């Protein structure tokens, strides 16, 4: 897992009224939590730094972060992953961010997004791509977590699908998503189904 460093500031004032003031100053309120922490750490993140994380794919892919938490003259460093980023759906503005603090020796359960690669044979034949699960839950050490999981659909034909169980993972990654979950499939268009049915009917009438 790639490591990205980001500086944040510890905040003492908590509540909606303070959160609004912070956001007007381009500071996004957030929290850092983790099993090894004595208590949650309430923080402020520069709006531009969050945009930078998004541009690097952190909102869609898994990356390890090194949080530099400034508290006056004191500084705390925590390894973390971006757990949740709340965005106002109307104004398209950041509201709050959650970071999950972890140790590098600690197994973590994380959702890793799926990246489809290649052009399926079934699509060239007129089939329709049907998405299943868009991310897979895995358990691994932080440095072993991939940013995404590539699924090659090149040989996928009409009527075929790929399940989680069809994917290959290294031994240091445990898959927690049910293996029978469908990742992607190619379904036939209506015309294709009718043609097959008509052909079968003609064969049956000749026997």
From Swiss-Prot:
GO annotation terms (biological process): translation
Keyword Ribonucleoprotein among UniProt keywords: yes
Membrane-traversing stretches: none
An example Gene Ontology CC term for this record: cytosolic large ribosomal subunit
GO molecular function: 5S rRNA binding; structural constituent of ribosome
UniProt-listed InterPro entries: Rbsml_bL25/Gln-tRNA_synth_N (IPR020056), Ribosomal_bL25/Gln-tRNA_synth (IPR011035), Ribosomal_bL25_b-dom (IPR020057), Ribosomal_bL25_C (IPR037121), Ribosomal_bL25_long (IPR001021), Ribosomal_L25_dom (IPR029751), Ribosomal_uL5_bac-type (IPR020930)
Keywords: Ribonucleoprotein, Ribosomal protein, RNA-binding, rRNA-binding
Gene3D superfamilies: Ribosomal protein L25, beta domain (2.170.120.20), Ribosomal Protein L25, Chain P (2.40.240.10)
Entry keyword NAD: no
Quaternary structure note: Part of the 50S ribosomal subunit; part of the 5S rRNA/L5/L18/L25 subcomplex. Contacts the 5S rRNA. Binds to the 5S rRNA independently of L5 and L18.
Known role: This is one of the proteins that binds to the 5S RNA in the ribosome where it forms part of the central protuberance.
Family: Belongs to the bacterial ribosomal protein bL25 family. CTC subfamily.
Protein's name in the database: Large ribosomal subunit protein bL25
Source organism of this protein record: Dictyoglomus turgidum (strain DSM 6724 / Z-1310)
Gene: rplY
């Amino acid at each position: 897992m790639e490591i990205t460093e980001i500086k944040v500031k510890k905040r003492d004032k908590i509540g909606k009224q303070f959160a609004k003031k912070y956001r007007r100053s381009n500071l996004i309120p957030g929290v850092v939590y983790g099993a090894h922490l004595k208590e949650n750490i309430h923080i402020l993140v520069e709006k531009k730094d969050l945009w930078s994380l998004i541009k690097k794919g952190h909102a869609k892919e898994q990356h390890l972060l090194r949080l530099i938490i400034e508290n006056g003259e004191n500084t705390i460093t925590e390894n973390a992953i971006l757990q949740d980023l709340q965005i106002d759906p109307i104004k398209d503005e950041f509201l709050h961010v959650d970071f999950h603090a972890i140790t590098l020796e600690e197994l973590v359960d994380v959702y890793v997004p799926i990246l489809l690669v290649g052009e399926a044979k079934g699509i060239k034949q007129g089939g329709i791509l049907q998405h299943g699960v868009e991310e897979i839950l895995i358990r691994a050490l932080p440095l072993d977590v991939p940013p995404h999981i590539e699924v090659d659909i090149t040989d996928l034909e009409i009527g075929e699908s790929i399940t989680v169980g069809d994917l290959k993972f290294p031994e240091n990654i445990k898959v927690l998503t049910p293996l029978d979950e469908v990742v992607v499939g190619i379904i036939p268009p209506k015309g294709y189904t009718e043609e097959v049915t008509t052909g079968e009917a003609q064969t049956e009438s000749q026997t």
